[in-house]
Curated annotation (Swiss-Prot):
CDD domains in UniProt: ALDH_C
MF term (GO), any: NAD binding
Organism name: Burkholderia cepacia (Pseudomonas cepacia)
Protein's UniProt name: Acetaldehyde dehydrogenase
InterPro entries, per database record: Acetaldehyde_dehydrogenase (IPR003361), Acetylaldehyde_DH_C (IPR015426), NAD(P)-bd_dom_sf (IPR036291), Semialdehyde_DH_NAD-bd (IPR000534)
Family the UniProt entry places it in: Belongs to the acetaldehyde dehydrogenase family.
Binding site for NAD(+): S12, G13, N14, I15, S163, A164, G165, P166, G167, T168, R169, A170, N171, N291
Organism domain of life: Bacteria
Gene behind this protein: bphG
Length: 313
């Protein structure tokens, strides 16, 4: 039987529980070692215990007291941005080389979008998975920017309010800041902006994302082909990821420029509009929670690629 590397998950909420189920069902080089929470009555800890996973409700300090801690190579942090900074610092005092997959917007490590720059950070000790909205939309900004220079990229992520637990709600400000920055650093836009909408509709609506870019004029066919190719790449690990409709284009001529606050008062170029839908795999919450699925799938894919390199060394 092939050797697998053990992982702990900090945060027994929606994201952590969904990720745990993915690892238990689909882990190739990664296996569950421990589930860590702070609420002894949490559903995530109860599920983990039923599935035979070591648990603690005493937070990251409780993790270090578990027998399995000595065998942990990976830690997925699904808490909050502020908590992640402390968790990383604390664990490194005991295991300096531990690999941290940051599922919060803390971003103390490099941003990682698997289909865009995942191969660039396989040796990093801490990688940041940006946000659910970033994982869905930044590949599309990158798809445009590999064809034409993108001056501005704006994304709107709409997720079901029911899929947003207390950790997500506590991170709203960090969500917009981290996603906006990653649109620039990873997506290639000169200026990025991110907006998140928690939709309270009942029954809950599926995750929807809209991406707008303003770029230099370029072949619309080339951009559309690049977008479709990128969507297929994301579908390799998030099967429910899809383009909702054909890519739309508007030519903004220099004779009729537009004003983009923070970018320029007289902007012209090619406006590209991309409409996405992300259906979840329903490993934990129902299929409307595509935001969980894309975040946990990206985190697991990144860890699997890191583990492949570590096991081959």
């Amino acid at each position: 039987m092939a050797r697998k590397l053990k992982a702990a998950i900090i945060g027994s909420g929606n994201i952590g529980t969904d990720l745990m189920i993915k690892i238990l069902r689909h882990g190739q080089n990664i296996e569950m070692g421990a589930m860590v929470g702070i609420d002894p009555a949490s559903d995530g800890l109860a599920r983990a215990a039923r599935m035979g996973v070591a648990t603690t409700h005493e937070g990251v300090e409780g993790l270090t007291r578990l027998d399995v801690f000595k065998d942990i190579d990976f830690v997925f942090d699904a808490t909050s941005a502020g908590a992640h900074v402390k968790n990383d610092a604390f664990l490194r005092t005991l295991k300096p080389g531990i690999r941290m997959i940051d599922l919060t917007p803390a971003a103390i490590g490099p941003y990682c979008i698997p289909v865009v720059n995942g191969e660039d950070h396989l040796d990093a000790l801490n990688v940041n998975m940006v946000t659910c909205g970033g994982q869905a939309t930044i590949p599309m900004v990158a798809a445009v920017s590999r064809v034409a220079k993108v001056h501005y990229g704006e994304i709107v992520a709409s997720i079901s309010s029911k899929s947003a637990g207390p950790g997500t709600r506590a991170n709203i400000d960090e969500f917009t800041e981290t996603t906006s920055k990653a649109i620039e650093v990873v997506g290639g836009a000169a200026k990025g902006k991110a907006i998140i909408v928690l939709n309270p509709a009942e029954p809950p609506l599926i995750m929807r994302d809209t991406v707008y870019t303003l770029s230099d004029f370029a072949s619309e066919d080339a951009i559309a082909e690049s977008v479709e190719r990128m969507a297929a790449d994301v579908q390799a690990y998030v099967p429910g990821y899809r383009l909702k409709q054909k890519v739309q284009f508007d030519r903004i001529e220099a004779s009729h420029p537009i004003n983009i606050p923070g970018v320029g008062p007289r902007m012209s170029g090619l406006k590209t509009s991309i409409f996405l839908e992300v259906e979840g795999a329903a490993h934990y919450l129902p299929a409307y929670a595509g935001n969980l699925d894309i975040m946990t799938s990206a985190g697991l894919r990144t860890a699997e690629h890191m583990a492949t390199r570590m096991l081959a060394a």
